[in-house]
């Protein structure tokens, strides 16, 4: 039976609950325990799949096809445990489930209320898989006091009461602001946050104090006294140069020991942190630097491409090289020649995205990389842009484009070398889609197998002829253009097992030019960099040595 750790936040949002949860999971693993991490989001969207990246950041896709919060990416990267659909839930999903049950008559005519029906649905979610691991770490999105979060706080209060004593603990992350006028760290916001938490029946066992300055011992004692928490369980959470320092930093501050003490686990197994020492060694002792241009649509918010940024960092670790990723808005290249902006870079990456805005700029970035011999990695839409560029400029399909960008019914602007995917094989059955389907949850989502051409560059990178990668797309390159494009040098080196869906393209006579329909960044880890990103950075290093 799993022990439960509930991680909550107070004072302000975006303090790093997700990273704290991931780091704690990694520390418990380092002591030999098995863990699973979950995220409970109070927003009313069913999932983040239809939310704007500017609103929410990236959507992290699991192997089983769930569209989830980017925090699940942190969970996977820090623990190596693949997330599942049952590891993410929102108020929208909870209320949807409750209403479906009401329509079916499952509640036998009772009046449906937040307590007990909504809270019971949340508790049912928490119980899934509780016999599989030693620790279940559950992060509650938002901050204590948010009106949307009240059912979740009530549910975890009830859940802790339902379990035997000592089976659940609460970790609360707050902010210690520094007031420069007085030269002091202020504890009142933390005290009031804990007071709010206690008013709804939850008493924190461990406090994490986010601070940009060293926390004096007297301030820790004061917080421990007024918040009714043991002083050893008042843990500093300082700003760090890199997120991958978090496990070692939290261990130095005693977070994992405080959690084990709260559960009464004594003597505690000693941690083996060699993995994280090696990660930090590779980051801090990089032997060079490469510049990678990320030409995208959502460049104003780096969280929109969070996993890509982290995967590039991992690729740098694999090569003991520092990767300096720089964001360029693709719309710039629709007005300007890309050459002056891109000539100082050692590699170019075009990430996934939706909609027509900026696509001509991405096509020009792909053309620049192809013609100048600069390493190019196109992901999802980035692969489609590379194919359209090759179709226009090599295969002489001058009006090549995507069905996604033909908005007017009956009026075609493009020859669609990229089309709306209406049918594909998933497992042992066929999935069918129509143009007028709902937007949410209707893409080709989750892990699918791809067959690689023996002897191709990608088969050498993967050291395999069959791979499994995660997808999130509803448009696909039309295989009918394969012969024409391969005749011009763009090889279809990865296909779906049935041979109908192109998964990877590459240019053989180019230093490094690869487009993939899937999202390799979602499977990269600091201690296990994704092979595509590792080799992409290696190619960038080679270019940097020629400059």
Curated annotation (Swiss-Prot):
Among SUPFAM superfamilies, the record links this protein to: Class I glutamine amidotransferase-like, P-loop containing nucleoside triphosphate hydrolases
Alphabetically sorted, this entry's keywords are: ATP-binding, Glutamine amidotransferase, Ligase, Magnesium, Metal-binding, Nucleotide-binding, Pyrimidine biosynthesis
Cross-referenced CDD domains:
CTPS_N, GATase1_CTP_Synthase
Any one Gene Ontology cellular component term annotated for this protein = cytosol
Q: Give residues annotated as binding ATP.
A: 14-19, 71
According to the UniProt record, what class of enzyme is this? ligase
The entry lists its GO molecular-function terms as: ATP binding; CTP synthase activity; glutaminase activity; identical protein binding; metal ion binding
EC number(s) from the headed UniProt entry: 6.3.4.2
Q: Where does CTP bind?
A: 13, 146-148, 186-191, 222
Q: Where is this region: Amidoligase domain?
A: 1-265
Enumerate the Pfam families for this protein: CTP_synth_N, GATase
Residues that bind L-glutamine: 353, 381-384, 404, 474
| Residue ranges of every copy of the Glutamine amidotransferase type-1 domain listed in the record | 291-546
Activity regulation reads: Allosterically activated by GTP, when glutamine is the substrate; GTP has no effect on the reaction when ammonia is the substrate. The allosteric effector GTP functions by stabilizing the protein conformation that binds the tetrahedral intermediate(s) formed during glutamine hydrolysis. Inhibited by the product CTP, via allosteric rather than competitive inhibition.
Classification via PROSITE patterns? GATASE_TYPE_1
Instruction: Provide the reaction this enzyme catalyses.
Output: UTP + L-glutamine + ATP + H2O = CTP + L-glutamate + ADP + phosphate + 2 H(+); L-glutamine + H2O = L-glutamate + NH4(+); UTP + NH4(+) + ATP = CTP + ADP + phosphate + 2 H(+)
- Residues that, per the record, bind UTP: 13, 186-191, 222
Residue sites binding Mg(2+) per the record: 71, 139
Subunit composition and interactions: Homotetramer.
Q: What else is known?
A: CTPSs have evolved a hybrid strategy for distinguishing between UTP and CTP. The overlapping regions of the product feedback inhibitory and substrate sites recognize a common feature in both compounds, the triphosphate moiety. To differentiate isosteric substrate and product pyrimidine rings, an additional pocket far from the expected kinase/ligase catalytic site, specifically recognizes the cytosine and ribose portions of the product inhibitor.
Q: Which PANTHER family match?
A: CTP SYNTHASE (PTHR11550), CTP SYNTHASE-RELATED (PTHR11550:SF0)
> What protein family is recorded?
Belongs to the CTP synthase family.
Give the protein's biological function: Catalyzes the ATP-dependent amination of UTP to CTP with either L-glutamine or ammonia as the source of nitrogen. Regulates intracellular CTP levels through interactions with the four ribonucleotide triphosphates.
Name recorded for this polypeptide: CTP synthase
User: Which gene is annotated as encoding this protein in its UniProt record?
Assistant: pyrG
């Amino acid at each position: 039976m799993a022990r439960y750790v509930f991680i909550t936040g107070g004072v302000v949002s975006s303090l790093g609950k997700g990273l704290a949860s991931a780091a704690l999971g990694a520390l418990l693993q380092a002591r030999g325990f098995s863990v699973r991490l979950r995220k409970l989001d109070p927003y009313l969207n069913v999932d983040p799949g239809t939310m704007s990246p500017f609103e929410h950041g990236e959507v992290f896709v699991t192997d089983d096809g769930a569209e989830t919060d980017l925090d699940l990416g942190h969970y996977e990267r820090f623990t190596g445990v693949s997330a599942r659909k049952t590891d993410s839930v929102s108020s929208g999903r909870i209320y949807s489930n409750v209403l479906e049950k009401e329509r079916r008559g499952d509640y036998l005519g009772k009046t449906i209320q937040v307590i007990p029906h909504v809270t019971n649905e949340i508790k049912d979610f928490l119980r899934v898989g509780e016999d599989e691991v030693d620790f279940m770490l559950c992060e509650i999105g938002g901050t204590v006091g948010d009106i949307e979060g009240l059912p979740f706080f009530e549910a975890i209060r009830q859940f802790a009461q339902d379990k035997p004593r000592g089976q659940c603990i609460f970790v609360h992350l707050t902010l210690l602001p520094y007031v420069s006028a007085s030269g002091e760290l202020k504890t009142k916001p933390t005290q009031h946050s804990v007071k709010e938490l206690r008013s709804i029946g939850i008493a924190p066992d461990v406090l994490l104090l986010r601070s940009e300055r060293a926390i004096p011992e007297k301030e820790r004692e004061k917080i421990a006294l007024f918040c009714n928490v043991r002083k050893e369980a008042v843990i500093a959470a300082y700003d760090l140069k890199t997120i991958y320092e978090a496990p070692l930093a939290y261990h130095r501050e005693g977070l994992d020991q405080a959690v084990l003490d709260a559960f009464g686990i004594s003597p505690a197994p000693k941690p083996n942190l060699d993995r994280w020492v090696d990660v930090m060694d590779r980051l801090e002792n990089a032997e060079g630097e490469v510049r990678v241009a990320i030409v995208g649509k959502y460049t104003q918010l780096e969280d929109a491409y969070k996993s890509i940024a982290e995967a590039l960092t991992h690729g740098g670790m694999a090569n003991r090289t520092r990767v300096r990723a720089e964001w360029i808005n693709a719309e710039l290249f629709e007005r300007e020649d890309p050459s002056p902006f891109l000539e100082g870079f050692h590699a170019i990456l075009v990430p996934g995205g939706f909609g027509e805005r900026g696509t001509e700029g991405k096509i020009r970035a792909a053309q620049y990389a192809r013609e100048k011999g600069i390493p190019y990695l196109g992901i999802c839409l980035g692969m489609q842009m590379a194919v359209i560029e090759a179709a226009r400029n090599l295969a002489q399909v001058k009006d090549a484009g995507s069905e996604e960008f033909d908005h007017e019914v009956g009026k075609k602007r493009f020859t669609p070398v990229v089309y709306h995917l209406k049918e594909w094989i998933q497992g042992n059955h066929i999935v069918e889609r129509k143009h007028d389907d709902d937007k949410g949850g209707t893409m080709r989502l989750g892990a699918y197998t791809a067959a690689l051409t023996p002897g191709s560059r990608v088969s050498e990178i993967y050291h395999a002829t069959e791979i499994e990668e995660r997808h999130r797309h509803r448009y696909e390159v039309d295989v009918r253009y394969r012969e024409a494009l391969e005749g011009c040098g763009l090889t279809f080196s990865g296909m779906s097992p049935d041979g109908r869906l192109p998964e990877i393209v590459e240019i053989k006579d180019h230093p490094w030019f690869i487009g993939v329909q899937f999202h390799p960044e979602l499977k990269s880890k600091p201690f296990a960099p994704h092979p595509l990103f590792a080799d992409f950075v290696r190619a960038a290093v080679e270019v940097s040595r020629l400059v």
